[in-house]
Amino acid sequence: MMVIPAVDIKGGKCVRLLQGDMNAETVFSDDPGAMAERWAEAGAELIHVVDLDGAIEKSPRNLKAISALIRRVGVPVQVGGGIREIDTVKMYADLGVARIVIGSAAVNHPDLVTAACREFPGRIVLGIDARDGRVATEGWTSTTDIAAADLAARFEGCGVAAINFTDIHRDGMRTGPNIPAIEAFARATAIPVVASGGVSTIDDIQALLGIQEFGVTGVITGRALYDGTLDLAEAIAVASAGDSTSQKSVG
């Protein structure tokens, strides 16, 4: 299971939010690239970057910071937030982004996901953010009537590399991941699942390893790393030691 550190960017700075609230931010660094480099040096094999302003404004807003981050780190980077058009997908691919995360557009413009998977095989990740099991969109400001598992089912077989599944109620709260919800979601799809939301300790990593067999192939963690309740190098070591054979693969 891969442990993936998150670098959320707002106004060019590295921040963390509580439950996606843009008004409840904590600034951890004026230099997102430096934070990403720190996580890479700790052993991260992939950095998860979110353009928070882009998610709200529906188009990239932190390209300068993201470009600098990509140039600085020597590991693959995946980017999400504000990706609504195929031209944006192409731009990020040309920029050197290893994986491009499509979230809200998967609900409103599903053809974008299909086209992106066709043009960039193995590089498209579906971002599904759930509030009480229902898909949230537009930077989590709107909740639909679509069940998270139903949205995932729409893209079975189109070549999506993975699904980033976020439990909004747990995001940034350090209350532990919602294991039953993650397991149920992973069981419902053949696509590899990367869990996000609530991870704060090594025990949480162990808990996720317990459902790895159902296709949970990675975990994204942010605030716990910045607050120091989770050591990235230790988490990576524990996750690697707990790896078991699975039919799904994040890679």
UniProtKB/Swiss-Prot annotation:
GO terms for cellular component: cytoplasm. The keyword Isomerase applies. It catalyses: 1-(5-phospho-beta-D-ribosyl)-5-[(5-phospho-beta-D-ribosylamino)methylideneamino]imidazole-4-carboxamide = 5-[(5-phospho-1-deoxy-D-ribulos-1-ylimino)methylamino]-1-(5-phospho-beta-D-ribosyl)imidazole-4-carboxamide. One of its GO terms (molecular function) is 1-(5-phosphoribosyl)-5-[(5-phosphoribosylamino)methylideneamino]imidazole-4-carboxamide isomerase activity. Gene3D superfamilies: Aldolase class I (3.20.20.70). It is found in: Cytoplasm. The active site is at D8, D129. Keywords: Amino-acid biosynthesis, Cytoplasm, Histidine biosynthesis, Isomerase. Belongs to the HisA/HisF family. This is 1-(5-phosphoribosyl)-5-[(5-phosphoribosylamino)methylideneamino] imidazole-4-carboxamide isomerase. It comes from Desulfosudis oleivorans (strain DSM 6200 / JCM 39069 / Hxd3) (Desulfococcus oleovorans).
